[in-house]
Structure formats: structure tokens, C-alpha cells
Amino acid sequence: MHPLPEYPRPSMRRDSYVNLNGPWDYAITQSSEFPAKWDGAILVPYSPEAKASGVGRTLQPGQWLHYHRTFTPPAGEGGRVLLHFGAVDYACAVEVNGRLAGGHRGGYWPFTLDITDLLRPQGRNTLWVAAQDPTGTGTQARGKQTLRPGGMFYPAQSGIWQTVWLERVPENYIDTLTVTPDYDARTVTVKVHTSKPGGAVNLWAVVRAGGVTIAEDWGSDEADRDGEVTLNIAEEHFFPWSPDSPFLYDLTVGTTQGEEEGFDTVHSYFALRKWECKEDAKGIRRFFLNGRPILLNGLLDQGYWPDGLYTPPSDAAVEHELHTVRELGFNLLRKHAKIEPERWYYHCDKLGIIVWQDMVNGGGAYPMWYVTYLTNALQPLMRRAPDGKLLWGFLGRGSAHSREEYARELADTVAALGQHPCIGCWVPFNEGWGQFDARKATETLRALDPSRPVDEASGWFDRGGGDVHSIHNYFYPLRIRPNMRTVALSEYGGIAWPMPGHEPPRKTYGYGTARSRAELTEHYCDLQRKTVLPQLKKGLSALVYTQLTDVEDEVNGLFTYDRTAIKPDAAAVRAVNEALEAEFEKAVKA
């Protein structure tokens, strides 16, 4: 049985699929050369630092992590064979049968290699991956990974950490699929690029709702040969997506290019929904979803697991966690300093969970005493800190190379996740970590994706741009004032309690403490009812409590690290969320 056997890319699904997760040979060496011997077996897709990998070793900067296995290509004849990696942290080279297939840099983004011409006509094939990860010694996106974990920073992880798979495709296959719904026009535009660009592409598309075909275009018009079609959604089949009704349309797309080129078919889905930031009936700026003001009430989600670090134990575990989030009455998760495997976003799409997506922080080393601790203590002053290259250097972006690297990572993130309806806001920077020229980042995001709000600088070093006035507040009285932007309390709370019966932290970390379940419940409910709720009528429109789960030493989650227990009383949490929603509805009424 393969770990994580589910098809890993729900937004572009094919029937041909061979999962390569499972035991591989591994070795950690000081050289990029093929190892003379193997150190043992590693369970892919778990990083060697993770218990679930069976290895339990930390890859150091400068070392090489080697993987090796044999494989049989997908059944069938002809066409091309593609090798997909969900993510490899950070840089890797890939060889098939001793010949270079390609490589990749970037620890959070998928990549694909066409290995057809490297395959043996008969027998088994060999696959070798050599990876390196500089962690904190580089400038690449790394999130909260560190070689010296503690407090709010967690163990580094390296190498393959998402599913590896093969598929057989036609000679001229669909390389990229872009699906652009238009809520106001009641349409969806489908565009493909194929592996052999430049020629005519005869495209067809079928939209289904609840298994019933509601729109189709079979590529009969000359206009369809440019690889793009637009389909109309009739009024009787118009079902907007929202947390209360997360309706997804099924989409099947194909190309018809004759026997030589083959016929490619992929399956996808989409939703119709519209985000706006505008004034409510009382002139206060709010988030609007599908023309209605909405309270975004959620949790900070860091995406770590006790045995797998970045990689979950199973798809069912992910789905269960997200179901519980909805059952508790939350409609938002802020995905913090990490990009998840695509199936995580797919489950959010299905369950109606809105996601605020952080760009994964990187850059050179920055002094945490200044960037986080001093800045937190002097928030009003730091919000006015002058922008420019001097500050960028303090924040780890002194080099032009690092800034260019961030621009590529930002574009890759939007390309990888932009088609998921659950994504409700982009967050280019958090608390100044690797921040530079935030206004430009916002402009870039709006050019890449004009359909979503931007929280330009979550926490501090605010430049006044974007759509959100984003506040982190753990220690001070909360005073919300009307703003030209929509106001979000994008981090707060963080009450720590190490729940008995679960693995204790090395050192308890949080923002305030509780001594029992009853005390944690009381502190949480008092914070929400007495501090947060009165601010809703003053303009507070989004809440992100810290946090969803315990993570390593940070025991301030609503769930335990292993997700087996909810720490505060679940009924009390639901009741508080209902009270917040009721107060918000009163606040936005004319």
C-alpha cells in the first residue's frame, strides 16, 4: 500500500496514474555523485527529519540527500510518460536510467519532467533523485523551518515531501489548464496550452452540476481552435459558492487532434463566487462575498504534523481536521508560512473553508529581536518605519538576487493555487519576515489575480497598501477604528495549555497560559466575547485566532498536535462563534 495513494492533483485529473510513494533507497553524503552504498530505506513522501520516514536524520546545508528506486511505466503504448513531483525541498536533480531528466529549485511548488526518451523499451527502469536544502543559510522560501527549533520556529524538513507519480499522456497533451469563472457574467472560460505549442488546438469542454450536463462546447467553431472556450451557466444552474453552500461544478476538458497526436482528456472543477472589499450600509468597509457582507472567523494554520512534519499521515486525517474546523463554526483558515499539497485546498473547496494564503517567507537572516520582538512592542512606531533598502537589509532582502527570487516564488504560488475557489486573500508578507517593497508585491498580485483581496503586510511594517488593515495583537488593549481598508485582526489569542495525556513540549510556548481545560475554555470565551465581539460594530471584519493546533513547543492550539482532542470545550467554542456571527449581522444592518 502506498502512503497517500489518492490522485494528488484534483484540479487536473487524468485516468492514467502510477503512484511512486513508498520505500525508496536513501543515502546522505557530502557529494552529488551517485552513492557507493545506501544508508537504508526511506518512506516517500516523508522527509528524512520526520519520524514517519523511518530515518530520523536532519539534512545539513552542503549535504546531499539521495533517493533511488526502480519503476515500471504506466500501462499502455505510445504517447509520452510524465514524472511528477508534488514538492521537493529545496533543489534537486533527477536522473532516469543514468541520464539527466531535469531538475528544479523551490521547495513548495510542483514540477513535471517528460522522461519518455529516457525509458528502456523493456524491463524495469531506475530513478535517482539528488536533493540539497540550505534551510536558514540560503535566501529561498523556507517558512518556519530552522535547524535550531524552539518557540515559534520548528524543525527543518528536506527532500521529497509530497507525492511522486507517473502518468501516460498523448503525444500532444494538455500541459496547463486555466479555468476562469465570471460570477457577474455567469460564465466560465477554459483555456489550455499543449505540449506542442504553435499549432491549432481543437478544444471541447463539458460542465456538469450534480452529475447533470448543464453546458457544453464540442469544438465545432473555428474560434475553438485557439485552445479557449467560454461556456454560459444558465440562471437555473447558477449556484454561488460560499461557506454555507460550497457548490462545485464538475468540468471535463479535452483536445481532439487526430490519431497521430492523440486525444487528451482531463477532469477538473470550479466555483462561481465574487470577493469585494467595500462599504456596508453604515459606511464601514467590510469583506463581501457574492454581494453580501461576511464575517471571516478563523484560525491560524501552520500545517505541521507530529510524525510527518510538513506531510500529513493520510488524506483522511486532513479531511477530518477540516471537517472539525467547520463543525466548530469557523469559516476561515490562514495558511501560515507554508503551501500545502493540492488536496488540502481541494478539501477546503469542498467544505467551504476560506483560505488566506501566506507567501512563504524567505530572504537572508534577519534579527528576530528586531523584526518580531521589538517591533511587536513598538507596533505604532514600526508601522511608520521608512521603507527602502536600509530597512530591506534588516528584513533579509538586501540582495537583488533574493528580491528576484521572491518575485518568482510569488508568481509560482499564484499559478499553483489561483484556481482554487477557497483562496480568499493573498498575504505577501508576515511581520516583516523577508519583506521589501510591499506596494510592488501588491501591484504584482493584482496584475496576476485581480479577483482576490490582498493583505499586504500582515502584522506590521504596514505601507498603507492592499485591501486590508492587518493587526497582530497579543498583548495590548484592542481598539478598532474605521479605516480606508477593511480591518482584520489577523493574529491574536495564542493561549497555551499542554493537555495531559499528549506528548509534552520541551518548553511551553504561547501568549498567556491556562492550567486546565476549564480555564482554557474560560480564557478563550472571555477573549472572544469581551474583547473581540464589541469591536465588530466598529469595523472589525476578519478574525484569525492563534491557532488551529499545537505545534512542537507551541501549545496554544485548539487541537492537540496529534489532532486526537479538542482542548477547549467544543460546545462553548461553537456558541461563541454563533454569538460573533449574530453580532456581526446586527452591525452591518442598515
Predicted regions and their residues:
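Secreted/periplasmic carbohydrate-active enzymes, especially glycoside hydrolases
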Residues: 1-347, 351-355, 409, 424-425, ...
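Substrate-binding/catalytic cleft of secreted carbohydrate-active enzymes
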Residues: 323, 332-577, 583-589
